[in-house]
């Protein structure tokens, strides 16, 4: 698939050069998180995005707009209404056409109860998304307070999902966690939150990290800090470009680094 994309790029030139194509990624997961606050993207915008990802060899799209009420509180326990479910199914199929893994994320932390009932409801929600064609799942515990922030409970839940859903299905991508302490400035090392996740989470679960701050350049020092705590390579959520904290204008500076 990616070789064809490279060929298409070469064919866009006036002349096709004599070339040998050796095409493989250095980074296994390359994509975009729709995980901002404010009006979510439209269906048409998402379709354009997925087509763009395919042309440019990006292979992951994570659906998690904060203002989707069925993604987080109050309705994360409920299935999508029929119309919204069909729209998501269209996106899932478009993602497959573009060789993109469509991840659907749930954000239950603000009102989750650490009991069997909520665990069962979460798995039922994931099953409903699986029936729509979703084959990638994420659990977000970012930007919350209270009971939902407990690292041991988060790890217990993620391991249960991994053992009783992801591994059972056999065709689902690795589970992703966005932790509560997802950047260095919010990390209480002595409190042991990240260490607990590193010790207790199943090995295959990916853990997100935004760098030294919420919006930050990703450099070696931040990875040297977090990777030993997580006992795995951090799954980078690079907050660029993001404008949800300055909604009166767009941030359109160049990519650098």
Region locations from a protein language model:
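Short beta-alpha junction loops
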Residues: 67-72, 143-144, 182
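Feature activates predominantly on carbohydrate-active enzymes
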Residues: 1-125, 131-135
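Aromatic-enriched hydrophobic runs in primary sequence
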Residues: 6-15, 43-50, 56-70, 100-101, ...
């Amino acid at each position: 698939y990616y070789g064809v994309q490279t060929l298409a790029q070469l064919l866009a030139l006036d002349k096709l050069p004599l070339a040998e194509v050796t095409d493989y990624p250095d980074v296994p997961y390359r994509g975009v998180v729709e995980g901002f606050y404010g009006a979510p993207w439209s269906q048409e915008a998402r379709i354009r995005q997925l087509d763009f990802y395919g042309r440019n060899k990006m292979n992951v799209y994570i659906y998690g707009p904060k203002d989707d009420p069925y993604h987080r509180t109050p309705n994360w326990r409920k299935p999508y209404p029929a119309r919204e479910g069909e729209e998501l199914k269209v996106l899932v199929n478009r993602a497959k056409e573009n060789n993109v893994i469509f991840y659907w994320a749930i954000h239950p932390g603000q009102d989750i109860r650490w009991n069997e009932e909520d665990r069962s409801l979460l798995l039922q929600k994931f099953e409903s998304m699986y029936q729509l064609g979703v084959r990638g799942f994420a659990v977000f515990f970012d930007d919350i307070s209270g009971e939902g922030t407990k690292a041991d409970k988060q790890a217990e839940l993620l391991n249960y999902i991994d053992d009783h859903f992801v591994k059972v299905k056999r065709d689902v991508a690795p589970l992703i966690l966005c932790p509560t302490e997802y950047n260095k400035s919010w990390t209480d090392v002595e409190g042991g939150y990240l260490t607990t996740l590193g010790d207790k989470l199943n090995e295959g679960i990916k853990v997100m990290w935004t760098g030294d701050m919420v919006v930050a350049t990703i450099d070696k020092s931040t990875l040297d800090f977090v990777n030993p705590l997580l006992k795995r390579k951090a799954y980078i959520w690079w907050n660029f470009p993001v404008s949800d904290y300055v909604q009166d204008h767009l941030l359109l500076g160049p990519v650098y680094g």
